[in-house]
Every structure is written in C-alpha cells, then in structure tokens.
Amino acid sequence: MKKFILIALLVSFSISSFAQRNSRANDDWYLSIGVNAINSLGTRSPFNSPSDWAFDLPISAAAEYNWSDTFAIEQSVTFNGFTEDTEIDGTELSKDYTYISFDTNVKYYFGQFIFPNLDWLEIHANAGVGFFHIDETNISANLGGGVLFWLNANRTFGLRLQTTGKFAFNHPESGFDNNHFQHHLQVVFKL
C-alpha cells in the first residue's frame, strides 16, 4: 500500500509540473515592443492586391495581462506613416500622413492543445476593438492571431509575430481611415 501511495504521489507531482511548464500562469504581465507594417487594402481582397504597404516610423508597443491559463487582455499602441506618392486604398497621396492606433484585444492561447510538448511555442487568436487615425478618426473591430516563440527556458523573453485585421465601423464614409491589416514583429518580456 505504501508503494502504491508513493507511486500515486510521484505521478501526481509529475503531471502537475508538466502542466505548469506548458501553461501560462495567472496574473502574469508581459511587455512587448517592436515594428509593424500596415497593408491598406480598404475593402479589396488581401489576396488580389497585397502591395499597398506602409512602413514609415513603424513602432508598436503593448502590455498584456493573463487572467487565466488561456486568456489574456492586451492594450497596444501603434505608430506608422504613409509617405507622399504612395497609395492608400488605390489613391495616390499628395502629402505624408501619420498613422496612430490604440487597440484593446482579448487573446485566447490554444497552442498547448495542438502542440502539448512544445513549451517554447504559443499560438493565439485575438479579437477586440480599436481606435485609429490617418486623415480622420475611426473605430474598428479587430480580429487576428499570432505566434510567440520563447527564446529561453524560463519563458521570460520571446519573439512574437502577429497579424490583426482592422475592420472600420464607418468605412463607406471614411476616406483613408478604412479597413486594413497590421502585421507586427515584437520582442516580448515577462515582467
């Protein structure tokens, strides 16, 4: 009986430590900073015209809070710009424009369900709302996803690739402030 209890405890501790290794902890904070590119497609298909890109002062930063093993909330700010003689939604620009956005997204981390043995990889889907400004101001519904590669065993330093589609609420009357995609490459630090 003692051997059975000892084996049961050993298995229990092993499973518990494995689960902790592969899941995000509650109450964790993360800070990320990096670059972004904007694909200003407007209402056009991203597969038919993926050529309208903005990459001028491409700074992005975010703070993320995990309230459970699989859910987090992220607040981000993004700066970018469009230079003269480039296009937004098929319209050539006659002057430079600055892009700024503030986004609040909920993230669902599901990578551990697909790759349970890869503790250095996290996959997420995100959805939320955003505020952005180019020539006018608009509000967007955000939908996207990404992947996070942890670069150390403690999972305190990583690299994230993330894409978010921003769908403008008032897009028929918005001019340049219309539907677009944001692509991010960020360094992530656990606080």
Describe the function of each predicted region.
Residues R21, G42, I73-E87, F149-L191:
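Predominantly the C-terminal beta-signal and adjacent terminal strand-loop region
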Residues D27-W29, W53-I59, D96-F102, L121, ...:
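Residues that define the transmembrane beta-barrel architecture of outer-membrane proteins
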Residues L31-N39, Q75-F79, T104, A125-F131, ...:
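Transmembrane beta-barrel strands of outer-membrane/channel proteins
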Residues A62-E64, K107-G111, G146-W150, V188-K190:
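Transmembrane beta-barrel domains of outer membrane proteins
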Residues Q20-Y65, K190:
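Short glycine/proline- and aromatic-enriched beta-strand/turn motifs that initiate or cap beta-hairpins
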Residues Y30-S32, D103-Y109, N179-L191:
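Outer-membrane beta-barrel "beta-signal"
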Residues Y65-A141, A153-R155:
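Gram-negative (and chloroplast) outer-membrane scaffold detector with strong preference
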Residues F4-V35, L118, R155:
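Outer-membrane beta-barrel biogenesis signature
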